[in-house]
Amino acid sequence: NPAYTVDFEGTPVGLVHPGVGAPFAAAVLEEAIACGVRKVIVCGGGGVLDREIAVGHLLVLQDAVRDEGTSYHYLPPSRRAAAHPEAVAALVSTLEGHGIPHLLATAWTTDAFYRETPAKVRLRRSEGCLCVEMEAAALFAVAQFRDIVLGQLLYAGDDVSGLDWDSRGWVHRHDNREQVLRLAFEACLRL
C-alpha cells in the first residue's frame, strides 16, 4: 500500500491504508515501524453489536477481544489486547476538546467475514464488546511487541446485532470518514 505524508496544520503526518484484515494490517504496521514510525493512531469504521449506537457515533478502542490469529504470533495467549493508554488519552482529549460524544469501547476483532452470527454477537456482547472489526487486536499486539504507542478511533457503521444485517449506508458516510481521519491526525499530534 502506498504511504503518504500529509501536511496537517503545519505538521507532516504519515498516512497509510493498512488494508482489511489482521494479517495484512499487521504487516503494514511492521513495515511502518521498520521505517521509524513510533506513534500511530488508526482510524476507520466498525460494525456495532448494539443498534442503539447511532451510525457515525465515535468509539475510542481501549482494547479488543482476540478472535483472530495474528495477535497470537506477537503476544502470549490472553483474551484481549489493549491499546496504549497514552494513545487512548490523546484520542479522548481530542474528542472532548471538540465536545464530540464518544464511547470507550472494547472491540471484537475477527478474521472471518460474514460470521457475526447471532450466537457470537450475544457472546461478544456478554464480554463487553460494543463493535466488531478485523484489525485492532493484531495492531495492538504488534504495537505492544514492538513497544510503540498505538490507539484506534472508529465510527459506528453497519449493525450486526439483529437477525438481518443492516448496512445503515455506512460505506457512503464520507463525512464520518473525513471526521475520523482529521481527529486521528489531531490526536496523533498530541502524542
Where in the sequence are the language-model features?
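Active-site rim beta-loop-alpha module in soluble metabolic enzymes
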Residues: 78-126
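Short acidic/polar active-site loop segments enriched in Thr and Asp
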Residues: 38-39, 130, 149
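Generic non-transmembrane alpha-helical segments
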Residues: 90-98, 142, 183-191
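Short glycine/serine/threonine-rich phosphate/pyrophosphate-binding segments
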Residues: 23-26, 134-139
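Metabolite-binding pocket within alpha/beta catalytic cores that recognizes anionic/polar moieties
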Residues: 1-90
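His/Asp/Glu-rich mid-to-C-terminal helical/loop segments that flank catalytic regions of hydrolases
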Residues: 160-191
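Zn-dependent metallopeptidase/amidohydrolase metal-coordination segment
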Residues: 137-172
